[in-house]
Amino acid sequence: MEYFDIRKMPVNLWRNGAGETREICCFPPATRDFHWRASIASIATNGEFARFPGMERVVTLLEGGEIHLESTDSFSHTLKQLQPFAFSGEQIVKAQLNEGQMSMDFNIMTRCNSCKAKVRIADRTFTTFGSRGGVVFVISGIWQLGDKVLTTDQGACWYDGKHTLRLLQSTGKLLFSEINWLPGYSPDQVQ
């Protein structure tokens, strides 16, 4: 289990200057040839997303103005807060900020031939399934994971196991991304 606070994470500027990324975790750890990766991105200006051939992306707008995403050959979609949207990393995708507002989003990328991410927003206590990787990010409220208390802009990632996330207040929201391995793959096989 790895815990994080995005306010204390290193920032990497995008090559096109349109935003910045804070990498949360990847599997296998510390490699460019990952099977899955989670990050938080701040988008400051209109521009193209980087292409990631062989990957599926799920993007969830966390804060800021809506973002219109356009792929000339495939889709036109407006990202709204806390509504995950999946698309192929192979596509050229242009991002247009609504009213020029800076936006922050959660990104999970998975290698198409080995695993898949399911992203959802939780508002009550829940337990994850065993033997799957996952990432949680606190949007609001106070949550407990094991003996650790997590608050806004904090989270955790893991590569397997069963975990209970307990909401300690009457209201709260948490982004949860579960990683499911495709048949023939498991965390033990790809490290």
UniProtKB/Swiss-Prot annotation:
Transmembrane intervals: none
InterPro entries hit by this protein: RmlC-like_jellyroll (IPR014710), RmlC_Cupin_sf (IPR011051), Uncharacterised_HutD/Ves (IPR010282), Uncharacterised_Ves (IPR023482)
Pfam families in UniProt: HutD
Superkingdom assignment: Bacteria
Family: Belongs to the Ves family.
Database matches in HAMAP family: Ves
This protein's name: Protein Ves
Organism of this sequence: Escherichia fergusonii (strain ATCC 35469 / DSM 13698 / CCUG 18766 / IAM 14443 / JCM 21226 / LMG 7866 / NBRC 102419 / NCTC 12128 / CDC 0568-73)
